[in-house]
């Protein structure tokens, strides 16, 4: 009986430590963000080769609305509840081809470029700036072309990443309309799946012991104007 109780308590604590990424700006949950498959159970993607590594969508349908943001500004992305596990936040953009609907575009192919990543503070343990936070300011590059975009939010939890397949990916995709901007086309684009391997040093890593003295973020370099 005690064993059963302990197992149930452990499972409950595990779920409560998970989170979703459901909202951008001043909108409501899942208004501008495509409803993720973890919207009820706060689960995660564990397979970097899964189609779910792209936007982790519960259904093929897009979100109800599109959030407007000015190039060169920032947009706030919200977690619910706050980020609990150690690991980096990363954000990618993908421009929707002209003539296609942002609400139905899948984001397939080498169309994603990274706009933000974070490095940990090194010491007795690795501490990422996102830990304990529930909102993040995502920079929208000033030089990119105006148009509709998908903004992919990703938190990679590394607390059990010492074994292959142990990293946990918390993901969602927001629908944006970017206004203003310039004419620059980012050259270093990746696809999801395809951008990561389960053996990448920023994915397969023991952050507990010995404590690393460096960290290599997975994916391409951050695009800068």
Swiss-Prot record:
InterPro entries: AA9, AA9_LPMO
Enzyme Commission identifier(s): 1.14.99.56
Pfam families: AA9
Catalytic activity: [(1->4)-beta-D-glucosyl]n+m + reduced acceptor + O2 = 4-dehydro-beta-D-glucosyl-[(1->4)-beta-D-glucosyl]n-1 + [(1->4)-beta-D-glucosyl]m + acceptor + H2O
Cofactor mode of binding and number, as noted: Binds 1 copper ion per subunit.
Protein location: Secreted
Entry cofactors: Cu(2+)
Alphabetical keyword list: Carbohydrate metabolism, Cellulose degradation, Copper, Disulfide bond, Metal-binding, Monooxygenase, Oxidoreductase, Polysaccharide degradation, Secreted, Signal
Annotated Cu(2+) binding sites: 18, 85, 170
Gene3D superfamilies the record matches: 2.70.50.70
Domain of life: Eukaryota
Disulfide-bonded cysteines: 55-173, 143-225
Applied value in biotechnology: Lignocellulose is the most abundant polymeric composite on Earth and is a recalcitrant but promising renewable substrate for industrial biotechnology applications. Together with cellobiose dehydrogenases (CDHs) an enzymatic system capable of oxidative cellulose cleavage is formed, which increases the efficiency of cellulases and put LPMOs at focus of biofuel research.
Biological processes, Gene Ontology terms: cellulose catabolic process
Residues annotated as binding O2: 159, 168
GO CC list: extracellular region
Single GO MF descriptor: monooxygenase activity
Position of the signal peptide: 1-17
Family: Belongs to the polysaccharide monooxygenase AA9 family.
Designated name of the protein: AA9 family lytic polysaccharide monooxygenase A
């Amino acid at each position: 009986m005690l064993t059963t109780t302990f197992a149930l308590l452990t499972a409950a604590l595990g779920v409560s430590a998970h989170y979703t990424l459901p909202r951008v700006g001043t909108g409501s949950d899942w208004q501008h963000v495509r409803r993720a498959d973890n919207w009820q159970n706060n689960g995660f993607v564990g397979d970097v080769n899964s189609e779910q590594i792209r936007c982790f969508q519960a259904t093929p349908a897009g979100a109800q609305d599109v959030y407007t943001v000015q190039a060169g500004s920032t947009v706030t992305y919200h977690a619910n509840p706050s980020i609990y596990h150690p690991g980096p936040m990363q954000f990618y953009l993908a421009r929707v081809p002209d003539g296609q609907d942002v609400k139905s575009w899948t984001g397939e192919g080498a169309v994603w470029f990274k706009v933000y990543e974070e490095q940990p503070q090194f010491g007795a343990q690795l501490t990422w700036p996102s830990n304990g936070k529930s909102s993040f300011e995502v920079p929208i590059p000033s030089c990119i072309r105006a148009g509709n975009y998908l903004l992919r939010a990703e938190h990679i939890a590394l607390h059990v990443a010492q074994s292959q397949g142990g990293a946990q990916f918390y993901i969602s995709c927001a629908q944006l309309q970017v206004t203003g901007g310039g004419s620059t086309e980012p050259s270093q684009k990746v696809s999801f799946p395809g951008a990561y391997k389960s053996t990448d040093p920023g994915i397969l890593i023991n952050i507990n012991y010995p404590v690393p003295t460096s960290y290599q973020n997975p994916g391409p370099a951050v695009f800068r104007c």
